[in-house]
Amino acid sequence: MLFTGDFETTTDVDDCRVWAWALCEIGNVDNFLYGNSIDSLMELLFNLDSKITVYFHNLKFDGEFILYWLFKNGYTFNSKRKYLNEKEFTTLISDRGVFYTIEICYYKSDTKRKTLKILDSLKILPFSIAEIAKAFSLPISKLEIDYKEKREIGHELTQSEIDYIRSDVTIAALGIEKLFEQNLKKMTTGSNAITEYKKIIGKSKFSKWFPPPVYDDDIRQSYRGGFTYLNPIYKNRDVGEGIVLDVNSLYPSVMYYNKLPYGEGIFFKGKYEHDNVYDLYIQMFSCQFVLKKDKIPTVQLKNNLAFVPTEYITNSGGEYVTMCMTNIDLELFLEHYEVFDINYISGWKFKSSDKLFKEYIDKWNGIKVKATKEKNKPMRTISKLMLNSLYGKFALNPNVQSKYPYLGEDNIVHYRLGPQETREPIYIPVGTFVTSWARYKTITSAQKVFDRFIYADTDSLHLVGTNPPENLDISDTELGCWKIESHFRRARFLRQKSYVEDEYCDIEDIEKYINDNPDLVNHIDLNNNTILKITCAGMPSSCYKYVNWDNFKIGNEFAGKLKISHTTGGIVLLDSPHTLRE
């Protein structure tokens, strides 16, 4: 049987416990169970006469209560996942503290073993519960309760509390059911995507195209994320009217149209020499450099103590810097910087094709277009997940390290690092070239509108002025084209991923916004028909109601943030202000 699960917990560090739990069967949401202690939940699960899997949404939180219960009830942690004995459990927790699974063996005989598997639904539905309800057009929505109300041990749940927790597990169950209907049953969205891709092209073709590279470490040095950059002349400045452009499906579009590597790479020394067959390459080189006038910087140096890893740099400071780039990034680098004393060290070259992912993207983009026309939000949501989750799986890091839980002398669950482990990589060349082409699209587009350019974030451009750029391909629907997403009356950009825009909206959108966000009516300006849209890395949406145009400034604090505190019993969320920092 498959269930979704949820805990409601106290907010007192001296009395941390589960005061309510709920289960909802996936595929049969009328099967709803609830109780008021973690003891009663575990007793129920261990007495169900079938193989049980429970999905908690954000297992990192709920999972710690389960781990504490296991330790206090005589269970022992075993890092060897395949060899669990009775009253042993194992976990899959990354070195960064990301929870994937908890597996518990609660009965074992010579002929039978009973286990309970607990997974994180956030890994397959990367949205909040409220967002899942909207994204899948579910007939129910997330409710509200007073989290801080004092609830004694044995508290009998009120009907409103039952309704609240039932809505949460039901929404998650219905969302997961939609995925299962498409046979998407893996542990993460990336695993679902690559499994589907293998079905489409065939496992033998996959193995031929993407042999696991023994040179993963070399290629991985060229792997970077999306391009996010604030034009310094607009930092901490109020900006007048402008527009926001988004690429229609950036990563799927570069996978569809651009040449990507396949097959075994060939190592070369020195500078790459033109090769009609092996026409994509990774180049290691060293040089000094200075940004050219009126050019956007394209270089970040992640593993060099002389530079801030998140900043795009304008010069090498008179030092020789060693870098590793795809030929796509290298082309941009040489175009945007004056380069001195370049020394080409070595690299890897690859065959290429622009047809590797066409069939996969044709299928899921077709589903997305059809779902959009039919206003089928569940299928549109699933198709977007499948389109955007594939490329990252190719960049899976083979060097991993888990965290192991233990109960400390302070009666609190702690985590220690396990040994370094190695798993087989998939094919990092695809991951690095997909992200490289995506950066190329965004950077070259921003450079074309340099005189208007304010800010870029992966697949978006924010520009001064309201006229559509004539030198960019504009379309509301065409894959890889720029779409005019919004028009703002004014904006303020503090730093990367931290800005507000007074966005023009029609009356219908304003009414819908009020209905969906009753706490945020202070963001609406009916005189100008605008809504204050907030983007702020690290600031939870619970802070937004305290933000306005005047106070969105460096140094200001905002209530509404919850800080995790590990304590006896599990985790307590404590009120903590969010401060806007440089």
Residue ranges of each PLM-predicted region?
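Conserved acidic
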Residues: 1-2, 13-54, 64-582
